[in-house]
Amino acid sequence: PNPACKDYSEEYQALYHEHMAKMLEERPWIWSSHVWNMFDFGCAARDEGGVAGRNNKGLVTLDRKVKKDSYYIYQAYWNKQPMVHLCGKRYAQRAGETTEIRVYSNQPSVTLFLNGEKVEELSAEKVFVFTVALKDGFNILTAQAGEVKDTMTLEKVEKEPEIYVLPEVNERAE
């Protein structure tokens, strides 16, 4: 799906934080910053992203178990230890001829592998975007930057699950 404002997807949140982290980096006169919110939290008045009673804008889930992709963009900007992170692990079933693979890293270049075969090596600043043609069935993707790497499994499907599409507000109320 194409992430858009008010869809409350992890993908849209990551795009938003990519923009914010880059803005902070480009403005050296900003001597302090913080992120609102570190964790999702309960909020009775909220009905967002198909979940009632939760503000889901945190970088980590309400139960503190899952670091969302947006968490890792700040690591790419602020962490001194080499790191690489493949985005979209929870968007695991994908349809279409090609799919976009986003990688966050604080290294100058990242190499992407599909089922053990090199796809491409890119140089970028923090956000690396690859276009990949998945094979039918399950695919193992590995992003590597020097000694650090991250791996995920995606499945190429004919049609993406309905759960990937946020119902309209009036549809959720039925």
How would you label these PLM feature ranges?
Residues 126:
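Charged DNA-binding/catalytic regions of mobile-element recombinases
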Residues 152-173:
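Low-complexity, Pro/Ser/Thr- and charge-rich linker/hinge segments at domain boundaries
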Residues 1-119, 123, 131-134, 140, ...:
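Extended substrate-binding grooves/exosites of carbohydrate-active enzymes
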